[in-house]
Amino acid sequence: MSALANHAFAKMNGIGNEIVVVDMRDSTAKVTPDDARAVASAQGGVPYDQLMVLQKPRLDGTEAFISIYNNDGSEAGACGNGMRCVVRRIFEKTGQATATFETAAGLLNAWQGPAPDLYTVDMGVPKFGWQDIPLAEEFRDTRYIELQIGPIDNPILHSPSVVSMGNPHAIFWVDDVNAYDLARFGPLLENHPIFPERANITLAHIVDRDHITIRTWERGAGLTRACGSAACATAVAAARLKRAERNVEITLPGGKLGIEWRERDDHVLMTGTATFEYEGNFDPALFAPAG
């Protein structure tokens, strides 16, 4: 039987990014990709974009090791909106105002934001090297790379900026983020051979130097109302191109995030809300073998 059968969970969202938080710090059992897919089942499951699993801390001074799953069962290195949901959950239960977590992408520090309903997560230092993103071939300058869809002489989307925020991101600069069928183009670009680990695909419009609008096709989850790491990647990419300041507001379909690419150490700070929806226990039938 799955470790998640009958296990408690919290359904939350980070500005529209659907999140399920499961605290398994008192267990040695492991969640499998099959478990993660079962949770999102249309037959009695809990719809989500990311599943955040808290496991026993492996390092002194950390609250937990966070395993992050997309709804297709694949693992993610980072999820900014999910981390804010975890932070709210921990802070409300313990009364803390600061915490450190370990993820596959490294250590993340978090703290209470400038207002009671805001939470800030230090998403770490972005990476720009083609091997770090990673890309399947060498690009010396990742501010733009040669990639397009559509006719060669009249491409529909082209020349994205690429960034790693612990997961790979490609940002296409457009005049109107709603003018493109992202549900059609997103999976084609996510699975393009240039991205050996697939990629998150974002359409971004720079409104002015401190405001950017985006839509994202999320790797392993699909079209989403919000992707925190995509907001971070977009802010960083725009600043690298000197088209935006290092402290910007990002508008997503689900809401707004404040992103600061801190100049003194290049860490990316993400500030936004985290909304609690309901609690429950997983139905064991979700994890029963088919047949």
Swiss-Prot record:
It catalyses: (2S,6S)-2,6-diaminopimelate = meso-2,6-diaminopimelate. GO terms for biological process: lysine biosynthetic process via diaminopimelate. This is Diaminopimelate epimerase. It is found in: Cytoplasm. The keyword Cytoplasm applies. Homodimer. Substrate binds at N17, Q50, N70, G80, N81, N167, N200, E218, R219, G228, S229. Keywords: Amino-acid biosynthesis, Cytoplasm, Isomerase, Lysine biosynthesis. Catalyzes the stereoinversion of LL-2,6-diaminopimelate (L,L-DAP) to meso-diaminopimelate (meso-DAP), a precursor of L-lysine and an essential component of the bacterial peptidoglycan. It comes from the Bacteria.
